[in-house]
Regions:
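Subset of outer-membrane beta-barrel
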Residues: 22-449
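Bacterial N-terminal signal peptides
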Residues: 8-15
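Bacterial N-terminal signal peptides that target proteins for export
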Residues: 1-8
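Sec/Tat signal peptide C-region and signal peptidase I cleavage site
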Residues: 16-21
């Protein structure tokens, strides 16, 4: 258990300090030019008859209140971990949310009245929230009383394999998209939501009074990843839903709800439990040798509270996302879009984000910029997107915050990017209704002649 907790903690801080991120708003504005946008808006219709992708499509999102230089400080020509500095800048509540996505495979086929797609994605999410009580302990040890009830952490990695169908109605004014997904859990760790732990230390005699309730760490997976990534025993079901409506030639509206689903964790499950305790008193010790403080603490806790391990299966939600946008077609090639994004994370509260973007839409390429705000870090961000076609090859990229490119890495606490390559065949610039209208007009002209 010790090794597992230490590894998870290290991963927690590495991911905090690595990248800068937002919530796919720039990528969303690539619209129907890129087939992967169906991952966040299943109602988007591809422009090409056949769309094929490989694992060369990936992206990441990170949002944190902690920066790299809050943890690592210069020490001559080297860097060192400075927990005192981390403790000095820590807020009452500190936050992290990250996501990595790899599109393993995707095949999209445009039909007469919509599209059908087949896909597989690998996703990993790490979310955490911790108080400055934890940073105080990390920096100075157990020298005073503390209470822990806001600490939360959830780490999930899973594969999704599915099929998506989009259908148009009312002369292509209305479109509805639905994607059904089989979920296969790869690895998971979560602290029970209602876990509470408090320790009252009397500085005069070092008596400890300890209380704990519902302190359980549920874990699963982490081994035989190749087998679990396809059809493992940690199974679940997910769904994406989207709807769009074209009010007139100028205005249209899109709504999508993604990642509605959960995973049942039944394979390689271990529950690490700290038994409930109420006002348990222990004659504490003063830690004089900081090198052995971890072992001393562990031994002391064993004398106070019993710990045990179990193998009970459990269920976890994957975290739903909501996107709503309003599109204004200023002219044939100039589009403005206002977007609202909300993430219902199963472990922490994440504030919604808002974006206002512009895209120049050409026949086979598009490029644009977007200004956004919101999220737990707030502030103003400026991003951009691009999709170009070179023969049957498509290259695309999107980023929500330019400062993640030119800013100092050690001062970063937020980032979002999407990159990929697709193979496209059978371009169709006009809708089916446009084609039918042209045929009718041609027949009328022929009869008139």
């Amino acid at each position: 258990m010790k090794k597992y907790i230490y590894t998870t903690s290290l991963l927690f801080f590495v991911l905090i300090s690595n990248i800068k991120a937002q919530e796919n708003l720039s990528f969303y504005n690539l619209n129907d030019y890129v087939i992967q946008t169906q991952n966040i808006s299943p109602v988007y219709l591809p422009k090409y008859k056949y769309n094929f992708s490989t694992p060369l499509n990936f992206g990441g999102d990170i949002n944190s209140t902690i920066k790299l230089n809050d943890i690592l400080v210069e020490n001559g020509n080297n860097l060192k971990i400075d927990l005192n500095n981390l403790n000095s800048v820590a807020e009452d509540n500190n936050f992290l949310a990250s996501e990595m996505v790899v599109n393993i495979f995707m095949l999209g086929i445009k039909t007469k009245r919509g599209s059908i797609s087949f896909f597989q994605n690998i996703k990993s999410n790490l979310t955490g929230e911790f108080s400055n009580n934890m940073t105080e302990i990390a920096a100075n040890g157990f020298v005073e009383s503390f209470s822990s009830s806001s600490e939360k952490i959830g780490l999930t990695a899973y594969s999704e394999i599915g099929v998506g169908i989009t259908r148009t109605f009312l002369k292509e004014k209305l479109a509805i998209g639905l994607r059904l997904k089989y979920l296969s859990g790869i690895a998971h760790a979560e602290l029970e939501d209602s876990a509470q732990f408090s320790l009252d230390i009397d500085p005069t005699n070092f008596l400890w009074t300890l209380n704990s309730s519902n302190v359980t760490l549920n874990t699963s997976g982490g081994t035989d990843i190749d087998k679990k990534a396809v059809f493992g025993q940690n199974a679940g079901f997910g769904m994406d839903f989207g709807i769009s409506y074209k009010l007139n030639d100028k205005f249209s509206f899109d709504f999508s709800a993604n990642d509605l689903g959960s995973i049942n964790w039944t394979e390689d499950v271990t529950n690490y439990n700290l038994e409930d305790a109420t006002d348990v008193v222990y004659n504490g010790i003063e830690f004089e040798n900081r090198d052995n403080v971890r072992d001393d603490l562990e031994n002391a806790l064993r004398n106070i509270i019993d710990t045990n391990e179990s193998n009970n299966s459990f269920k976890s939600n994957i975290g739903s996302k909501i996107l709503f946008s309003s599109k204004y077609q200023m002219s044939e090639k100039n589009v403005f879009r206002a977007t609202y994004f909300s993430y219902n994370n199963p472990y922490v509260d994440i504030k919604p984000s808002f974006g206002l973007g512009y895209n120049r839409e050409l026949n086979k390429s598009t490029y644009g910029v977007i200004a956004s705000t919101g999220g737990n870090n707030g502030g103003f961000r400026l991003g951009a997107n691009l999709a170009v076609q070179l023969g049957f090859l498509q290259l695309y990229g999107a980023i929500d915050d330019f400062s993640s490119l030119y800013g100092k890495v050690e001062q970063s606490n937020e980032a979002n990017f999407r990159l990929g390559i697709n193979f496209l065949f059978g371009y169709s610039a006009k809708s089916n209704d446009d084609k039918l209208a042209e045929k009718d007009q041609l027949l009328i002209n022929n009869k008139a002649n």
